[in-house]
């Protein structure tokens, strides 16, 4: 049986002040871990508010001991994170000595919504989602996936949709972003999907979380994107994949 280790580390660029002591001149590294990396372990624990599986708190404690200072969640479902209410999840993470920084979650548009351009029902879902993330102490909500649209019109609709989500996040003191994989570098009606998204979303409402591995896997240069679109990448994700392992979307 092959054991597969996937590590996604969220580098909290410009998110947390760097602490420097005048006496030692040592810089404190602020690095958050994406909990999707340990999903197989977390998914086995049985958490309920009022009763918490000891294995769950042990995992958080071990991550903190390894040097991680914050977490990015990836399990928002029915108003909870890992079967814990937003406030309880925040308490769990902080009790382990880390901060709740971000969360991967999204709601894609249906064929009907894309055809009509009316995504008001999805926005109702987002209203509750944003409220739950705010209660959990999140600073960022990041959409981790969208399929390649069939038409440029559909991609334009998604950009408008993301702008509206981002606007609503801003109103609640959060920021909304998008996390890439490699498929965003495909073309839609002659235009690179990722570039189109960067150019048709409002920087005031939408930032991008660059996954360096997937940019390179998509045969592009992360540095080129940083230079071409300054200020759009607020956080950076580093995905680790061993050479002998097959690609998985992380």
Which ranges hold each PLM region?
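Conserved small/polar residues in nucleotide/adenosyl-binding loops
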Residues: 239-246
